[in-house]
Amino acid sequence: FISYLFGLSILLPTQHWTGIYVGNLPWLILCFAQALIFILPALLMRRNHRANQLIFPLSYVIIELLLRTVPFTGFGWSRLSLTQTDSPYDSVYRQIGLAGMALVIATIVIVRNIKHILILAVILASVYFIPDNIIEEKPIAVALVQGGVVNLGLDFNNKPREVFMRHLNQTTFSISPSAVDLIIWPENAVDVDVFRNDDIRIQIEKLSQDLDTPILVGAVTRSSQGLNNQAILFEPKISQTYSKRYLTPFGEYLPLRSVAESISKYATRIDDFYPGKEFITFNVNGVKFNSLICYELINDSFTKENVNDFLVIQTNNATFGDTPQLDQQLNIARVRAIESGRGVAYVSTTGITSFIDANGKVTNSLDKFEPGTSIKEMTTYSGRTNVQKIGYSVEIISLGLLVMTLGYRRWKMDV
């Protein structure tokens, strides 16, 4: 019961924003269901048993694995391992990733022996001296455009072309020809289909041509399969397109539509999107980057892909209003910067549009809900961090050690 309350104490406040426009019931169902996962250590541990110092941290790694994978691809937003961007041991992200950070946090919580505490401190300090092969490369000048929206909420784009015009005008008035190497608009900045509305596509092409600069836009399009959430590069014609692969359950598709519609009247307003299938590397004048679109930034499986010169994250936060979601998502982007050893161009319709360096520090940012443009010369990088090399090894090893520890404890009891 205490473990369940612990789970609720984490989930209820941090995920309250999920119900801001759709009512409290979906938020409560999500949190009360996910809190069941936190019972795992209580089921495995025995009172005052020495093995608890192993079982608890190992089982907590599995808790976070379950949070990010089940049900319906999971919702790993509130993992404690995402909270250490300003801690003295933030470089753990670069070495052993989020799973490793979960292991470290849980170990710190349960260790009581002073000798073990000192050993742990030495191990954490040594993390800073583990080498990687991340190399600085040539810089690229990037402009991030935060055009804003008229209304916050689910109806942020109820007036067709309004969001597009705000980003078009902001770009026109704030960026001079050839001033930067790349202009980036956020997710949903183009609120009508560029493949079905020639006038919109032509305006973006003309803007790219007039500024002599490629423009990466976020757009919703419709294919024969259904809706697609895309990042589209204009140079000035459309040269490359990436379709979001990791869709938001109950946001971009409804896994249990009939049940969801009976719970919330807002469910009928959600159209199912069709996931993309391919990873795309964008190339602008020899500089390569990939884009994560909104919810994709919490998918740990994409970590190994973030090895291009820099990383772009495009998001639309208008549907979450003025809530902690904006700051939480920016913090997750900082984690991705640290673990990949890459600078991040993080651009949102409403905020908090920011540049993040390879150490996870925010170097430039725009005010929330105010239109603006942020320009910075970003350092690019090559090479892979250690966590990108080891993949899911920490989770696999933790699961194996947990099974072995439980088996050994059972064997000792039987002897």
Model-derived features: positions:
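Membrane-embedded alpha-helical bundles of multi-pass enzymes
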Residues: 1-129, 322, 349-350, 363, ...
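Soluble catalytic domains of enzymes that build or remodel membrane lipids, polysaccharides, and related
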Residues: 133-389
